[in-house]
């Protein structure tokens, strides 16, 4: 039988956090907020970057890692620079193979701020890796996370709502 939209349940069994890998992206005291996916408008990364000043006001030792590639990369980098986020946002580029799994294990929070998302395999993978997850209240993401039970939801396209959910996890989960 084929299971549509499934994930390999054995993918992260026995896998520990690789601190050497993690230190490529953040200092030990920093909490990694991870976005992994295509850098296109509907993935909502621009809203996550817009949320960072409020996130940092609520939790200074946070760092956003953006892993992926896509047509918005230059626009997103310019947005981060315009907001003065400098060392608090890191563009990791495309990750493949075992680096994807290592990055999930390195993350403290994963965020999927899509404005349109039919399903959201990446959110399932993050949750399977044991990473607290924030998703938008749209499409399939809305169906896989129960707010404040197995993740947090935020209003799609709303940086303030996104920041509130992320800061809540940073302050209360860790």
Residue ranges, per PLM feature:
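A short helix/loop element that forms part of the nucleotide-sugar donor recognition site in Leloir-type
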Residues: 13-26
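Nucleotide-activated donor-binding/catalytic signature segment of Leloir-type glycosyltransferases, i.e.
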Residues: 75-95
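A conserved mid-protein helix/loop that constitutes part of the nucleotide-sugar donor-binding site
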Residues: 31-54, 64, 71-77, 160
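Aromatic "clamp/platform" in nucleotide-sugar-dependent glycosyltransferases that forms part
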Residues: 115
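Carbohydrate-associated surface elements
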Residues: 6
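Conserved acidic donor-binding segment of nucleotide-sugar-dependent glycosyltransferases
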Residues: 147-148, 152-159, 168-174
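Short alpha-helical donor nucleotide-sugar binding micro-motif in glycosyltransferases
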Residues: 94-95, 102-107
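Short hydrophobic beta-strand element within catalytic cores of glycosyltransferases
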Residues: 132-135, 145
């Amino acid at each position: 039988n084929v299971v549509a939209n499934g994930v390999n349940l054995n993918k992260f069994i026995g896998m520990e956090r690789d601190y050497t890998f993690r230190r490529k992206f953040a200092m030990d005291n920093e909490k990694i907020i991870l976005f992994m996916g295509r850098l296109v408008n509907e993935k909502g990364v621009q809203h996550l970057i817009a949320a960072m000043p409020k996130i940092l006001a609520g939790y200074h030792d946070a760092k956003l890692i953006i892993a992926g590639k896509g047509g918005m990369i230059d626009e997103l980098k310019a947005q981060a620079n315009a907001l003065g986020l400098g060392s608090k946002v890191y563009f990791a580029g495309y990750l493949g193979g075992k680096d994807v799994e290592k990055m999930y294990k390195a993350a403290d929070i994963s965020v999927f701020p899509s404005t349109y998302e039919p399903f959201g395999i990446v959110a399932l993978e993050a949750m399977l890796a044991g990473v607290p997850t924030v998703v938008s209240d749209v499409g399939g993401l809305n169906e896989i996370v129960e707010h404040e039970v197995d993740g947090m939801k935020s209003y799609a396209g709303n940086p303030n709502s996104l920041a509130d959910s992320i800061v809540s996890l940073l302050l209360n989960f860790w």
